[in-house]
Regions:
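Outer-pore turret/helix-boundary of cation channels
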Residues: 72-100
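Membrane-water interface of transmembrane alpha-helices
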Residues: 31-47
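Pore domain of cation channels
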Residues: 23-32, 96-101, 110-152
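Interfacial helix-start motif at the membrane-water boundary
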Residues: 56-76
Length: 171
């Protein structure tokens, strides 16, 4: 087997894409996990305090701010993928790199596969990173809704002027 055959085999199997993709997937998931846990921790503490202080509208505000932060986390990860594609000169410009990353990360696939030969598998790895990140985010959002729903219900109980003993039983 000659060097040319080895290079062709490496390219045909997309080995550089696997190595680069798995490394980036790990980096993206580490960033995602760190930021996600920070958002969740801050939401849980603040919403618990606001519930205990009967500041039910503040719980909703913190909930929506947390959702915005989760969204921004995903945007950051798409940009991180885009920058990495551009740094490795896999796409012609940063804008196209970010757009391609977003298209694959969200699994929407609205862009053509413009990656060079030997790097095609990278699109699938980016899609997996997005699926993993969205699943993790969804699980955190589900846990966040408990305090949000409790605050929402308590706020409406107060607006309906239900007796205090009824409201206290709900807590």
């Amino acid at each position: 087997m000659t060097i040319t055959n080895t290079v062709n085999l490496t390219t045909e199997l997309d080995l550089p894409a696997y190595l680069f993709g798995i490394t980036m997937l790990l980096i993206v998931m580490l960033v995602h996990g760190f930021v996600l846990l920070q958002i969740a921790k801050r939401y849980e503490v603040k919403s618990f305090l606001y519930l205990s202080e009967q500041k039910y509208s503040s719980v909703a505000l913190v909930f929506y701010i947390s959702i915005l932060c989760l969204f921004l986390t995903h945007l950051f990860e798409i940009i991180l993928w885009g920058i990495s594609l551009r740094v490795f000169n896999l796409l012609p410009n940063l804008g196209q790199s970010i757009l391609f990353s977003g298209s694959t990360y969200t699994a929407m696939g609205f862009m053509d596969d413009s990656l060079p030969n030997g790097w095609k598998m990278l699109a699938i790895i980016i899609a997996f990173s997005g699926m993993f990140a969205f699943a993790w985010t969804a699980s955190v959002m589900i846990s966040m809704t408990k305090n949000f729903r409790q605050a929402y219900t308590l706020l409406h109980m107060q607006k309906l002027k239900l007796p205090t003993e009824v409201i206290e039983r709900f807590k």
